[in-house]
């Protein structure tokens, strides 16, 4: 078991930024696919870009911009982009910094995670206005006498048909799942038991009434949405399980196993820890048993993951490799690589037109305060 302080330190970077990674000597075999830029267009739009969503109903891409940090920080906002040109059509101002997003397209709602404020901002995608803030928890006074939030946020998933929003709350003292009623915009449950570590991954199977999370104790934890409690917990071979994609037609979970040297160094300082896999892969699991079905090599620093089940395609952002890699989700063979340097972060798909959208973070060499990009990949 890793010490709590180790996990908190190792996970601090992505707890704030929704992204992390460090260069690694381990890389995927690129024999089956070469890097391509011909299908990629990109546009710098704002500082501090994070997650994004495509709305078929509004025919728009919505992207969260935190504005960054420090004296050069810009405004926090959600940007509505033209899906063909990536031009900013509308800037929706927010009171709090924007990081994660999830879209309930049928109900014209975009839910935006305010990571550092442990809250969610609700945006009306039809009117392009913020319509509310859900405070998930209040600050508590610590041993130092200062008031602070005990949990921060990362991923959000929504069950629009049942009026429920699920949000992971990170803490080395015990991560939780917040449950929000999307009609009243009230927290109706806070489910403990996600592990005494950061819990970066989150996926919903509304039909099966299950939420799946991952944590940095190398676990996948299943929560029942009806029972409101942890139903299953599996130890997995992924030492740094990050984002999760769920196969809606089968029993599979796809989990990015990042292989960050930064996290590994912290893990190595923990009593009894011995690294057994370099990561840099997607782990395929049977979500009913936790059994490992496959291990798919990726480029360096895999983070975001998206499954297009209809076309049998799996897409992964490789944050340190500067690429998005595509795989056949049945054979697990790599079929394409798209160069999107410096740090591709999050993914969204226009399933009808078969177009992928990617947020791209700046690297250390870019000027401080420079705008970050959204890439459009015609698949």
Could you tell me what each predicted segment is?
Residues 2-5, 19-379:
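Predominantly soluble domains enriched in secretory-pathway, periplasmic, or organellar proteins
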Residues 11-21:
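Bacterial N-terminal signal peptides
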């Amino acid at each position: 078991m890793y010490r709590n302080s180790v996990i908190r330190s190792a996970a601090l970077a992505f707890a704030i930024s929704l992204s992390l990674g460090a260069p690694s000597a381990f890389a995927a075999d690129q024999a089956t696919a070469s890097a391509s830029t011909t299908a990629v267009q990109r546009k710098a739009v704002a500082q501090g870009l994070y997650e994004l969503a495509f709305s078929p109903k509004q025919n728009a891409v919505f992207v969260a911009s935190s504005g960054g940090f420090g004296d050069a920080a810009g405004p926090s906002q959600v940007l509505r982009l033209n899906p063909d040109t990536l031009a900013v059509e509308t800037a929706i101002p927010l009171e709090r910094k924007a990081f994660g997003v999830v879209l309930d397209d049928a109900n014209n709602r975009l839910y935006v995670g305010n990571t550092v404020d442990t809250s969610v901002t609700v945006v009306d995608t039809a009117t392009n206005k913020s319509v509310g803030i859900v405070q998930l928890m209040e600050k508590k006074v610590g041993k130092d006498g200062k008031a602070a939030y005990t949990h921060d946020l990362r991923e959000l998933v929504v069950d629009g048909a049942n009026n429920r929003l699920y949000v992971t709350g990170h803490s080395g003292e015990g991560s939780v799942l917040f449950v929000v009623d999307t009609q009243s915009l009230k927290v109706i449950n806070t489910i403990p038991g996600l592990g005494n570590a950061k819990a970066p991954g989150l996926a919903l199977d509304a039909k099966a009434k299950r939420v799946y999370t991952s944590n940095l104790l190398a676990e996948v934890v299943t929560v029942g949405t009806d029972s409101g409690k942890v139903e299953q917990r599996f130890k997995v071979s992924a030492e740094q399980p990050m984002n999760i994609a769920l196969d809606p037609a089968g029993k599979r979970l796809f989990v990015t196993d990042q292989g960050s040297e930064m996290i590994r160094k912290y893990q190595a300082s923990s009593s009894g820890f011995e690294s057994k896999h370099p990561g840099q892969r997607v782990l395929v699991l049977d979500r009913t048993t936790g059994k490992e079905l496959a291990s798919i090599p990726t480029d360096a620093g895999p983070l975001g993951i998206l499954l297009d089940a209809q076309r049998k395609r799996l897409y992964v952002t490789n944050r340190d490799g500067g690429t998005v890699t595509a795989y056949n989700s049945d054979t697990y063979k790599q079929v394409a690589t798209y160069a999107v340097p410096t740090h591709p972060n999050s993914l969204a798909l226009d399933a009808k037109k078969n177009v992928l959208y990617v947020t791209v973070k700046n690297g250390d060499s870019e000027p401080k305060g420079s705008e970050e990009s959204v890439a459009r990949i015609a698949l």
